[in-house]
Swiss-Prot record:
The gene is dctA. It comes from Paracidovorax citrulli (strain AAC00-1). The chain crosses the membrane at residues 17-37, 53-73, 85-105, 153-173, 193-213, 231-251, 306-326, 339-359, 361-381. The keyword Transmembrane helix applies. It is a multi-pass membrane protein. GO terms for cellular component: plasma membrane. This is C4-dicarboxylate transport protein. Responsible for the transport of dicarboxylates such as succinate, fumarate, and malate from the periplasm across the membrane.
Length: 451
């Protein structure tokens, strides 16, 4: 069997499709939260439990994927080149997202005419987000990449810290050459076991999506959407514009269709829609990107790093929310103020993780740093932040997926034939049963023998 051999598709009954299961769960969650809000709020542990299950497996998966990818490479200089190109891409595209958010909010002006008195706003609800020290400086962010201990990084699940350890371990293992084969094989087999566990966890994804959506609608209600509908509509429109125009053009220039790519990750998008966290599908996205033809090393470096440096949806949200607050409170923002805001956001936006609520914390820190826009205005959008979090997470997910393919192509680590095959046939078996891919990989590994 060749490396590019196509896995025979197994047509599953519709009710066994993860996409259908999650879609059904989200709809039921919305209905329960709307008609029985008290019961809906009590469903929160279901969503929290699912995200905790995923988080417990993220650190070891990143470690194994990156170590195997780096240790198995012949040209070690390529690792540095891949990381450098990824950071360059992240900076350019996230900056474009910030600018697009700024342009759209100035054109549509969703906060104009609200005439809110900033001094009369009750700030008790946002006190937890605006407390001193909630978000550190750039130096703090960089220093936090270095863990206190190796165990501490894994215990806390700090993605960038685990990534640093994995890169160092991979380089060290590579230097051992043939003497490190036993360790290499153990880590590779372990990664297969971990992805099988992910397959088990994803079977309860519909329950997690149901619980999270029931809680969101039950706690915040549909009414909160209507009161600030113009901002919500503007934000969702901007995210769609960014995904299908900006990312669509990037995808087209690199030989694939954004529409086909979105269809390919439809299960992940629905899970993120339900949980409002792009982290909930991180392991599954790594597996799916690898099976699109991207090399393991590239996937292991780009996806985890992107969760801190390539949050396109969060970037759009930050500029739009900041200017919206200024418009709603009649705070004048001239071109100088807006450029200053943009420059500050270029730094603070890199401190947002791919978890629910992080964007709001970054926004609070940014408004405090800029000083011109009243921080009290955050209370205006607190009620709908959870709903906007869903669009942020969805955009972040698509953005990181596209980034992986683009960087893989730049570094020559992309099998374009496999990419085309997978996108043209998105209903392949791995979309429903990740463990089948692992069986396929094991079979290939047994045929090829050693690394």
């Amino acid at each position: 069997m060749t490396a590019n051999a196509r896995i025979p598709a197994r047509k599953l009954p519709l009710y066994r499709s993860l996409y259908v299961q999650v879609l059904f769960a989200v709809v039921v969650g919305v209905l329960l939260g709307h008609f029985y809000p008290e019961i809906g709020e009590k469903m929160k542990p279901l969503g929290d439990g699912f995200i905790k299950l995923i988080k417990m497996i993220i650190a070891p998966i990143i470690f194994c994927t990156v170590v195997v990818g780096i240790a198995g490479m012949e040209d070690m200089k390529k690792v540095g080149r891949t990381g450098g190109l990824a950071l360059l891409y992240f900076e350019i595209v996230s900056s474009v997202a910030l600018v697009i958010g700024l342009i759209v909010v100035n054109v549509l002006q969703p906060g104009a005419g609200m005439n809110v008195d900033a001094s009369a706003i009750d700030t008790k609800s946002i006190a937890a987000y605006t407390a001193p020290g909630k978000m550190g400086t750039t130096t703090d962010f960089l220093m936090n990449i270095i863990p206190t201990t190796v165990v501490d990084a894994f215990a806390k699940g700090e993605i960038l810290q685990v990534l640093l350890i994995a890169v160092m371990f991979g380089f060290a293992l590579h230097r051992f050459g043939g003497r490190g084969t036993l360790v290499f094989d153990f880590i590779e087999k372990t990664s297969h076991v971990l992805f099988t566990i992910v397959g088990y966890i994803m079977k309860v994804a519909p329950i997690g999506a149901f619980g999270a959506m029931s809680f969101t609608i039950g706690k915040y209600g549909v009414g909160s959407l209507l009161s600030l509908g113009k901002l919500m509509g503007s934000f969702y429109l901007t995210c769609l514009l960014f995904v299908f125009v900006v990312l669509g053009l990037i995808a087209r220039f690199h030989g694939f269709s954004i529409w086909k790519f979105v269809k390919y990750i439809k299960e992940e998008l629905l899970i993120v829609l339900g949980t409002s966290s792009s982290e909930s599908v991180l392991p599954r996205m790594m597996e799916k990107m690898e099976n699109l033809g991207a090399r393991k090393t590239t996937v292991g470096l780009v996806i985890p790093t992107g969760y801190s440096f390539n949050l396109d949806g969060t970037s759009i949200y930050l500029t739009m929310a900041a200017v919206f607050i200024a418009q709603a409170t009649n705070t004048p923002l001239d071109i100088t103020h807006q450029i200053t805001l943009l420059l500050v956001l270029l730094l603070t936006s890199k401190g947002a993780a791919g978890i629910t609520g992080s964007g709001f914390i970054v926004l609070a820190a940014t408004l405090s740093a800029v000083g011109h826009v009243p921080v009290a205005g955050l209370a205006l959008i607190l009620g709908i932040d959870r709903f906007m979090s869903e669009a942020r997470a969805l955009t972040n997910l698509v953005g990181n997926g596209v980034a992986t393919i683009v960087v893989a192509k730049w570094t020559g680590d992309l099998d374009t034939e496999q990419l085309k095959q997978r996108l043209d046939n998105p209903d392949w078996v791995a979309a429903q049963e990740p463990e089948a891919i692992l069986d396929h990989k094991t079979e290939r590994m047994d045929v090829s023998g050693s690394r």
